[in-house]
């Protein structure tokens, strides 16, 4: 647990003190350390569950709507290419897997902030029993994966004659 915390701490660009004047607004070294940790925990709190910063597992944001004939999902995948998306449906579980490739990191630049995520992502969504798994369609445009899942025709109750 401690190692994971240290790994997360090291992944942030903590402020570096270059000279004593940078500490003037702090009353002592402890107030500087308090500020560093407060900033760290505020940044951690800003991440929404289930996104995990240290291993960069992402869960794309999704809107799900329905009408009389189908379910419609819109999944935000900014910066992801269509070739890096895998979509499957099995036993009424829709799974979206993929990878967001990292652009070349600038070795000769010092980052002041680095908020963009890279790496693998996965999202599984349980679907109702009335979906037609054989006729699912998907389209990817402008960073939005649009998935249409038709509903099966509901079987109508038949009256049974009792003899």
Curated annotation (Swiss-Prot):
Keyword Nucleotide-binding tagged: no
Residue ranges constituting the sHSP domain according to the UniProt record: 53-163
PROSITE patterns registered for this protein in UniProt: SHSP
Pfam families, per the entry: HSP20 (PF00011)
Presence of the UniProt keyword Cell cycle in the record: no
InterPro entries reported for this sequence: A-crystallin/Hsp20_dom, CS_dom, HSP20-like_chaperone, Small_HSP
Gene3D superfamilies to which the protein is assigned, alphabetical: 2.60.40.790
Keywords: Plasmid, Stress response
Family classification: Belongs to the small heat shock protein (HSP20) family.
Name this protein carries in UniProt: Small heat shock protein C4
Species in which this protein is naturally found: Rickettsia felis (strain ATCC VR-1525 / URRWXCal2) (Rickettsia azadi)
């Amino acid at each position: 647990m401690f190692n994971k915390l240290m790994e997360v701490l090291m992944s942030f660009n903590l402020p570096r003190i270059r000279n004593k004047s940078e500490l003037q607004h702090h009353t002592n070294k402890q107030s500087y350390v308090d500020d560093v940790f407060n900033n760290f925990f505020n940044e951690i709190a800003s991440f929404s569950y289930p996104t995990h910063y240290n291993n960069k597992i992402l869960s794309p944001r999704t809107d799900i709507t329905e009408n009389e004939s189908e379910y419609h999902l819109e999944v935000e995948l900014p910066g992801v290419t269509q070739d890096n998306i895998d979509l499957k449906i099995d036993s009424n579980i829709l799974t979206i897997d993929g990878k967001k490739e990292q652009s070349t990191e600038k070795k000769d630049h010092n980052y002041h902030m680095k908020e963009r995520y890279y790496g693998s992502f996965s999202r599984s969504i349980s679907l109702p029993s009335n979906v037609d798994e054989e006729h699912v369609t998907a389209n990817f445009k402008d960073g939005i994966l649009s998935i249409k899942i038709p509903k099966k025709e509901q079987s109508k109750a038949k009256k049974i004659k009792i003899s």
